[in-house]
Amino acid sequence: MAAATTTTSRPLLLSRQQAAASSLQCRLPRRPGSSLFAGQGQASTPNVRCMAVVDTASAPAPAAARKRSSYDMITLTTWLLKQEQEGVIDNEMTIVLSSISTACKQIASLVQRAPISNLTGVQGATNVQGEDQKKLDVISNEVFSNCLRWSGRTGVIASEEEDVPVAVEESYSGNYIVVFDPLDGSSNIDAAVSTGSIFGIYSPSDECHIGDDATLDEVTQMCIVNVCQPGSNLLAAGYCMYSSSVIFVLTIGTGVYVFTLDPMYGEFVLTQEKVQIPKSGKIYSFNEGNYALWDDKLKKYMDSLKEPGTSGKPYSARYIGSLVGDFHRTMLYGGIYGYPSDQKSKNGKLRLLYECAPMSFIAEQAGGKGSDGHQRVLDIMPTAVHQRVPLYVGSVEEVEKVEKFLSSE
């Protein structure tokens, strides 16, 4: 508050907020040899100079030190707009991610109502991998595809449930390429166990341009070229877990952020920032039912986890059977998730584009690691849209440990 000068004895009025934040010191200048007051009971009218002095004891606390209100929520939409304002992402990416979050909300509702709406059980068809499609697999794929098409910002979409990538109609077409598994762990639906959706976002490949006069076969080939990019090219990746809470995990290359769906407002709210995977952990997540089919080196690794070791305690086994659920626990608690190759699945079971690359990108952004047992997953150049690879992902020390066993003579 600037110094103020008055020439009358009129009182100086302050608002309650100003009065609480400051006190007034008034200095009355006197001429040499004169008294402050002239005569008895009669005040002179000297110039009065008043200055506000900040009372540090009663001043409000700085914003950083102020306790955050329980109603001061940062929604996914608000967070995305902030990233756009700061130049981290562009407007098109904001719209694509918002469309994906909308699809996840719809799928979450379908999953919760599946037994009521008779959406459990199989559809009666198989997907391109020869797997029986659940009813919710088909519906979730349609929901995801429609949300991405109507966003007007995607050029090519590739789903685990579709034979080939699909070019979005020109009237709705955009630039981004989105790969996704609409409902991971759908075999758990009938038992109401955690499921999830996984996605990754790429820019178009420089080698691929679809001309206006391209034939259907040419468009398909160009779509495949566009989609078959290494995970190191990912611009964003994430997953949504449908469990006791609906959790949306996202990275745009600046760390991992966790949003939780608030059923009261129907919005994803930021609940964790810059998540970091512990450097090591004492939890392993493998389907040990396939132990007899594993390589001897992998068997030795698994046996080592069950020995007391230096800590005096063996590792704990935790396996849900849903990649999203098992990975989310691994990310928070540390440890390792693995789905290796075996005699039955020579190249592993998980898809590189839709599952392994996005999860490995998230893991690395959280300070972890993703490997196929011999090399970084994000460095693998896809040779087919539905290519499968082994996956070991989680804490850096745990992934490096299994790599040492697999590379031993």
From Swiss-Prot:
Binds 3 Mg(2+) ions per subunit. In photosynthetically active tissues, and in the shoot and root apical meristems. Mg(2+) 3 binds at D181, D184, E355. Its EC number is 3.1.3.11. Mg(2+) 2 binds at E160, D181, L183. Residues 1-49 form a transit peptide. NCBIfam families: PRK09293.1-1. Homotetramer. Belongs to the FBPase class 1 family. This is Fructose-1,6-bisphosphatase, chloroplastic. It comes from Triticum aestivum (Wheat).
